[in-house]
Amino acid sequence: MKRYKIGIVPAAGDDAASLMTIASLEEPQMTDLLIPVLYDSKERVERLREGHESDTRFVFLPSAEEAREECVCVVDTSRAAQEADAGDTASALPVWQSDLRDGNIDALVLVGDADIDQCTDGASAVVYLSEADCMALVGREHIAEELEKVVRLLERDLDYSKPRMAVVADTDRQKEEWEAKAEELGAFLYGPFLTETFFEEEQQRNFDVILAFDPATARNCFREAAHAWGVCLAEDGEGRVTLYPAYNTQPMGEDAASFNAISLNRALYSAVDVLRGRARYDEGHTSPLPKLFYERRDERRGGNIE
């Protein structure tokens, strides 16, 4: 099975995020599942790994293009920053963003105490995943277009076919608009439910997917309802995927670090699941006619040669 290149970026200056990332990638199953590309400074990786006993190899490479299987590939971000300062880089984007744009990596996972709302601003679609629940954000300005994007993402990337979906909103304005679009898409929508009441009564257990029309309120309620609430997935207009481990907001005391690691691992697994799901979906929806044409043509040519 194909192994995808997943870029992982610990927050700059956050040794805890970097240490957690290194510990996660040292687990043997990670390099069996994917090709991890760690964007971090060589100095920090070597310092934090000092004294670690691990069978996982960390290989320092100049770029993600050279990343290979059976090891953790480290792209030295301090070197990339020096080259950018020297004017050797045409793009002002961070190296990991450039690699995602150019197809050198298949997905990106950003680790650390980032403002997820700010990071996902302008994304084409945003989905939150916890252990059992899935919540997608739907903008009010262009409901029909937003619903179509979300339903397509759920079916293509997360294998939700005709899910039972609950609309949570603090008003039923525009209800006729989204009901008409849902009927056109063949989606099963229920609601709208008041956001806070919906989560207080744990009604999310009765549905496969939550569609949130009031993102700010819904995000807070979703996070509080989840035990270790998992992952935020954002897709841009070109279909590129970035995931954010969304650390538990509940005080966990000494267990906080372990729950954060669970969230990070879930983000890595989710990245692979999304890419595999997308490939399977695209393969199933690709017309077989071009392939048949070339196969038949080759058969005819072979027959003529004989």
Residue spans of the language-model regions?
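Anion-binding alpha/beta catalytic cores of soluble intermediary-metabolism enzymes, centered on
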Residues: M1-E306
